[in-house]
Swiss-Prot record:
Organism: Dictyoglomus turgidum (strain DSM 6724 / Z-1310)
The protein, known as: Small ribosomal subunit protein bS21
Keywords annotated in UniProt: Ribonucleoprotein, Ribosomal protein
Cellular component annotations (GO), alphabetically ordered: ribonucleoprotein complex; ribosome
InterPro entries, per database record: Ribosomal_bS21 (IPR001911), Ribosomal_bS21_sf (IPR038380)
Pfam families: Ribosomal_S21
PANTHER family listed in its UniProt record: MITOCHONDRIAL 28S RIBOSOMAL PROTEIN S21 (PTHR21109), SMALL RIBOSOMAL SUBUNIT PROTEIN BS21 (PTHR21109:SF22)
A single GO molecular function term of this UniProt record: structural constituent of ribosome
Amino acid sequence: MTEVRVGKDESLDSALKRFKKKLQEDGVLADIRRHEYYEKPSEKRNRKKAQSKKKK
């Protein structure tokens, strides 16, 4: 679970900004987006192939 503690003189906006950044670093947002809808196994394979080609 991602946790951010708000300091005494810290605004809520800056704490929220840090929280969102932490979520993005942990990969939580990407995971939520990936599970937003059903992805067929063939689509998963194609996405992974394209991703591996992109890395090369």
